[in-house]
């Protein structure tokens, strides 16, 4: 993949990630003045995850690093715009949730209940379930760590 193709794929990924970020921000009743920042933060988070995955990191660690970046930027923006950090960060990480692997795990569970146990179905179920669980854990821990670091009252040493 050349540089131009990568930049076009990155721009497409970021634009398509901004759309659900704004949609979920509207569902969560985020103020209108903050919607564009939710879209930008969702695009930054998903784009950074794509860059990390392209550079060779797996999806779990890429999601963890991207959610830490989203949390850090959200805390900084909350200071600038006098809003709670969750206004920006929660809607921004929604596009990174593992819908495909969770859906595949659920379909495998339904097939096992209908057709009975088979080893390929069980492998598919466990692989996708563990991937989805790891990504959700990476999102939640990655969002909470910047708050623990930046709001710390005691000295670090």
UniProtKB/Swiss-Prot annotation:
Location (main, coarse): membrane
Transmembrane feature ranges: 8-28, 50-70, 87-107, 129-149
InterPro entries assigned: ThrE_2, ThrE_Dicarb/AminoAcid_Exp, YjjB
Keyword annotations from UniProtKB, A to Z: Cell inner membrane, Cell membrane, Membrane, Transmembrane, Transmembrane helix, Transport
Coiled-coil ranges per UniProt: none
Superkingdom of source: Bacteria
Pfam families for the chain: ThrE_2
Subcellular location per the Swiss-Prot or TrEMBL entry: Cell inner membrane
Sequence similarity: Belongs to the ThrE exporter (TC 2.A.79) family.
UniProt-listed PANTHER family: SUCCINATE TRANSPORTER SUBUNIT YJJB-RELATED, UPF0442 PROTEIN YJJB-RELATED
HAMAP family in alphabetical order: YjjB
The protein's name: Probable succinate transporter subunit YjjB
Organism: Escherichia coli O1:K1 / APEC
């Amino acid at each position: 993949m050349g540089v131009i193709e990568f930049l076009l794929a990155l721009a497409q990924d970021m634009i398509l990630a901004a759309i659900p970020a704004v949609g979920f921000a509207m569902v969560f009743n985020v103020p209108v003045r903050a919607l564009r920042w939710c879209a930008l933060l969702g695009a930054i988070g998903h784009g950074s995850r794509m860059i990390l995955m392209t550079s060779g990191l797996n999806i779990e660690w890429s999601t963890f690093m991207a959610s830490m970046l989203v949390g850090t930027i959200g805390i900084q923006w909350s200071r600038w715009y006098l809003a709670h950090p969750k206004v920006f960060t929660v809607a921004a990480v929604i596009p990174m949730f593992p819908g495909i692997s969770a859906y595949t795990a659920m379909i495998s569970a339904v097939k096992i209940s209908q057709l009975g146990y088979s080893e390929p179905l069980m492998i598919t179920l466990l692989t996708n379930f563990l991937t989805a669980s790891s990504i959700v854990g990476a999102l939640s821990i990655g969002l909470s760590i910047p708050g623990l670091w930046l709001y710390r009252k005691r000295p670090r040493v």
